[in-house]
A protein has these predicted regions:
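C-terminal substrate-binding subdomain of Rossmann-fold SDR/epimerase-dehydratase oxidoreductases
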Residues: 14, 18, 146-226
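NAD(P)-dependent short-chain dehydrogenase/reductase
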Residues: 98-102, 106, 110-162, 167-178, ...
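Rossmann-fold scaffold of SDR-type NAD(P)-dependent oxidoreductases
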Residues: 8, 45-50, 88, 187
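Conserved Rossmann-fold NAD(P)-dependent oxidoreductase catalytic core, especially the SDR/UDP-sugar
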Residues: 49, 72-102, 119
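N-terminal Rossmann NAD(P)H-binding glycine-rich loop of SDR-like oxidoreductase domains
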Residues: 4-21
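Adenosine-cofactor binding site in Rossmann-like domains, unifying the SAM/SAH pocket
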Residues: 22-39
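NAD(P)H-binding glycine-rich loop region in Rossmannoid oxidoreductase-like domains
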Residues: 38-68
Length: 226
């Protein structure tokens, strides 16, 4: 019998995950569906909880809404589906908490302990198909500036280190983890970092002119999967 699957959050990663679960039900906060309110009354076997407020500068400005969706939305989901196998989207931002978003993802990791069959998975700078060029993610931002020939600005001197993860690899491993009996918290990344300036050269083919802005309070200098 085919397992009943729910995917919350059908943005960049959720859209790629749907390729592996074409018959899954979906729930997306962008469509006005509130995960803090009543959730679908169905006995799901497997749930991927990806829905979240994630743009870090916006989360800083709208902290209450970020906490409501990311924290209380997760608690609501865990309480609503006590018998499902659940994977929660965590983040490398909780490794060194410097933002409201990172704080909420640390909460998500700890909340996984409230459920008998739950795994929180920490993502590391995911890139790939269906990712919007606009927004705060590093890879699409660089590609957008290169294609539009617009001035590139970064925070800091470009010596930040990042572990970038291809979304195709990420979703395949999410499926494997869903079928496993692993619980608690785990990491999905390559464990191999690249310096931002070198990454810029890789995408552009050379080092373009860059405007270096001051480091922000929420900027993390090194993000690497163990």
């Amino acid at each position: 019998m085919e397992k009943r699957v729910l995917i919350t959050g059908v943005g960049f990663i959720g859209t790629n995950l749907l390729k592996l679960y074409p018959n899954a039900d979906t729930l997306d906060i962008k469509d006005g569906q509130d995960i803090c309110d009543k959730l679908p009354d169905k006995p799901y076997d497997q749930i991927f909880h990806l829905a979240a407020k994630h743009h870090i500068p916006t989360c800083e400005k709208e902290a209450e809404e970020c906490i409501r969706v990311n924290c209380w939305g997760t608690i609501n989901l865990l309480k609503t589906y006590p018998n499902a196998r659940i994977i929660l989207a965590a983040s490398s931002s909780s490794n060194e908490i410097k933002s409201v978003y990172g704080l909420t993802k640390a909460f998500v990791e700890n909340a996984s302990q409230l459920h008998k069959n739950c795994l929180a998975v920490k993502f590391y700078n995911v890139f790939g198909e269906h990712q919007k060029l606009e927004g705060g993610a590093v890879t699409p931002k660089l590609i957008w500036h290169m294609l539009t020939k617009t001035p590139l600005e970064i925070n800091g001197d470009g010596t930040q280190a990042r572990d970038f993860t291809y979304v195709g690899d990420l979703v395949k491993n999410l499926k494997l983890l869903m079928e496993s009996d692993q619980r608690g918290v785990t990491h999905l990344g390559y464990g191999d970092t690249i310096i931002l300036n070198n990454y810029i050269k890789l995408i552009y083919g050379k080092m373009p002119k860059v405007k270096n802005n001051p480091i922000q309070l929420f900027d993390i200098l090194r993000s690497e999967s163990p």
